[in-house]
């Protein structure tokens, strides 16, 4: 099953697309590839499943904590199924700086949250770029890290960098240098994006590009309406799922106080980690149930 994408995807009730089968084959070797595919085409599974099927450690790196939160549930489900089918425990680590958690999945279907110090000893590690850089290359006084030389070749490790088009300025420079370091060290990695300018591709050390074929997909029109009174605009869209974006946290907080009630949520980068996650979960539940809300 390690070399059979059809059989491995079937474990989760899925069927691989031609693009996912191609990535599965490329990942057999020593990939240093760019995967270009639109949102919703299964990039996550395309990159992750080859590592899970072959028993490699997967380090999945995202630009933001919210994207890590979004993927956590999916990987918990996958590892729980694998632990039961393979008859051996699996582990997931979530490391975002604000939150460090380790989940152990037993063959009997049990799930246990633990606080072990050796965070990166797991089958799947979900983290952000800034935290990965800190953990692997943190040589400041008092935070010396030997994770990179000690762990990077412990097992066959595959690094996956998703949504890389979101990196800008300093973050992009740091990312580019990290990719160069991994490439020169012979470490396996995949870089994923929905889109990437040619100039950006040229800056990365890559073996090749796998591009998802263009497909006709349903389109959604987003109307940008910066003018007008926010309260009036909101009232005219009652009963719908509405995202209200303001320039400053103070403005958003004041508007939230005026509207506070059922289905009204405030979300911004200064929220405490626990509150941010609670808001995110509630909004996701309403989205799934297609219930109205105001964010």
Regions found by a protein language model. Give the residues of each.
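N-terminal helicase ATP-binding lobe
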Residues: 1-295
């Amino acid at each position: 099953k390690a070399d059979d994408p059809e059989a491995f995807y079937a474990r989760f009730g899925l069927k691989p697309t031609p693009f996912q089968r191609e990535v599965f084959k490329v990942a057999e070797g020593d990939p240093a590839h760019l995967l270009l595919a639109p949102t919703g085409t299964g990039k996550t599974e395309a990159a992750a499943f080859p590592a899970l099927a072959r028993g490699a450690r997967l380090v999945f790196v995202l630009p933001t904590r919210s994207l890590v939160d979004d993927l956590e549930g999916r990987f918990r489900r996958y590892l729980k199924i694998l632990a039961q089918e393979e008859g051996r425990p699996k582990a997931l680590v979530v490391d975002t700086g604000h939150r460090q958690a380790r989940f152990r999945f037993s063959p009997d279907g049990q799930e246990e949250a633990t606080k072990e110090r050796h965070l990166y000893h797991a089958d799947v590690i979900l983290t952000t770029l800034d935290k990965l850089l800190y953990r692997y290359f943190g040589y400041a006084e008092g935070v010396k890290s030997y994770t990179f030389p000690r762990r990077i070749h412990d097992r066959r490790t595959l690094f996956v960098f998703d949504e890389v088009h979101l990196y800008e300025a300093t973050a992009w420079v740091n990312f580019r240098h990290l990719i160069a370091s991994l490439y020169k060290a012979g470490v396996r990695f995949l870089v994923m994006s929905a889109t990437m300018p040619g100039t950006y591709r040229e800056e990365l050390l890559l073996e090749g590009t796998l591009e998802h074929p263009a497909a006709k997909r349903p389109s959604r029109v987003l109307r940008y309406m910066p003018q007008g009174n926010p309260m009036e605009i909101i009232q005219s869209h009652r009963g719908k799922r509405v995202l209200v974006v303001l320039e400053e946290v103070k403005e958003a907080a004041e508007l939230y106080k005026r509207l506070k009630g059922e289905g009204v949520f405030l979300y911004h980068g200064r929220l405490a980690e626990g509150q941010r996650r609670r808001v995110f979960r509630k909004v996701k539940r309403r989205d799934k149930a297609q219930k109205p809300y105001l964010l």
